Amino acid sequence: MISCHSFTMTPSAPNSTVLPSATPVCPQSSACRWRGLIETYRPYLPVSDQTPVVTLLEGNTPLIPAPAIAKRIGKDVRVFVKYDGLNPTGSFKDRGMTMAISKAKEAGAKAVICASTGNTSAAAAAYARRAGLRAFVIIPDGYVALGKLGQALIYGAEVIAIDGNFDDALTTVRQLSEHYPVTLVNSVNPYRLEGQKTAAFEIVDVLGQAPDWLCIPVGNAGNITAYWMGFCQYKELGKGDRLPRMMGFQAAGSAPFIQGQPISHPETLATAIRIGNPANWDKAWAASRESNGEFHPVTDAEILEAYRILAAEEGVFCEPASAASVAGLLKQKDQVPAGATVVCVLTGNGLKDPDCAVQNSGNQVKAGLKPDLEIVAKAMGF
């Protein structure tokens, strides 16, 4: 029996109105102009008329059919990928950051801070600068993809690299936010999860129902927590009559949920989920337990294979950590019920880590050819 005991609807903020039905203000299927997550799902978020909405029109990302992956599973299974790499800064973090920064500005904050493996720093910097706030970012030195670091820098974040891992960085920013006038915007900030839960709303709005399985990469465990919050809230409002199994997948070298305890030295090429001590530990376990879900490990080799399949067979270019959801689905395909609908969450854009694509594509540039018709045609196989 699947239930939502640990996740209740967010109380309405003062001066906000809860609609009697679960119909969003501006559903994906409508022809109206997209206005960003807060305006679209305002009745279901802890905002009021006094909340200054800071938005880059995030959300409304596509739910893309994945027939090549479905064919590998068989059994008349339908597979979709929720491609959050098409958010403004290229990852799902924008969903949470529109809420976190809007509420920080409402509270009078002048600066925000986060620890990051890359995506959080990009989103925090973009939304903070749009709001006119300073953005401080603490990163683990040498463990952030250049595409993500470049984003944070060009947005104007004040970046500090520490000799340590993400967990060390998170401990540092938590301490700083307790002693200095900076607002913490990592996923321990509850407004982050409120924003991120809207991805579940969008999936139900498109499918008309929750999927049977929701496959998701797990790092700091905020996203699996947020999706479960969203599915539970929508069901309580009468939007659909079922809940998905939450299937969380971790890199084998960075898998505290599989080991059942935090780990000190996580290692994986999927840097976005290279986290040994997830901040949302208890909530993620609750989401898994209440949904009859599971956590499973996937190796770096399995992640890279799924990464290549998504690009070469589905035309979807995601960052390596995102592909953990598809790697996990393929690894657990014998468990998938016949006729099931499965959604795999792709958390970030492949352009976040172009070096990984170049190094692992299995493809090569045929360089040094003369601009001669016959020579080029021969290189093309004609």
From Swiss-Prot:
Q: Which cysteines are joined by disulfide bonds?
A: none
Tell me a Gene Ontology molecular-function term this record carries.
threonine synthase activity
Q: Among its keywords, does the record have Lyase? A: yes
Concerning its family, UniProt says: Belongs to the threonine synthase family.
Q: Which organism is it from?
A: Synechocystis sp. (strain ATCC 27184 / PCC 6803 / Kazusa)
Q: Which domain of life is it from?
A: Bacteria
NCBIfam families recorded: thrC (TIGR00260)
The record's keywords, sorted A to Z, are:
Amino-acid biosynthesis, Lyase, Pyridoxal phosphate, Threonine biosynthesis
Q: Which GO terms describe its cellular component?
A: cytoplasm
* Coiled-coil parts of chain: none
Co-factor requirement: pyridoxal 5'-phosphate
**Protein name, UniProt field:** Threonine synthase
List the InterPro entries hit by this protein, alphabetically: Rhodanese-like_dom (IPR001763), Ser/Thr_Dehydratase (IPR050147), Ser/Thr_deHydtase_PyrdxlP-BS (IPR000634), Thr_synthase-like (IPR004450), Thr_Synthase_bac/arc (IPR026260), TrpB-like_PALP (IPR001926), TrpB-like_PALP_sf (IPR036052)
Q: Which reaction does it catalyse?
A: O-phospho-L-homoserine + H2O = L-threonine + phosphate
Q: Name one Pfam family in it.
A: PALP
Gene3D superfamilies xrefs = 3.40.50.1100
Instruction: Supply the PROSITE patterns for this chain.
Output: DEHYDRATASE_SER_THR
Detail which positions bind pyridoxal 5'-phosphate. Answer: N119, G219, N220, A221, G222, N223, T347
Q: What is its EC number?
A: 4.2.3.1
- Pathway where it operates: Amino-acid biosynthesis; L-threonine biosynthesis; L-threonine from L-aspartate: step 5/5
Q: Which GO terms describe its biological process?
A: cysteine biosynthetic process; threonine biosynthetic process
Primary enzyme class? lyase
Spell out which residues are annotated as carrying N6-(pyridoxal phosphate)lysine. K93
State what this protein does.
Answer: Catalyzes the gamma-elimination of phosphate from L-phosphohomoserine and the beta-addition of water to produce L-threonine.
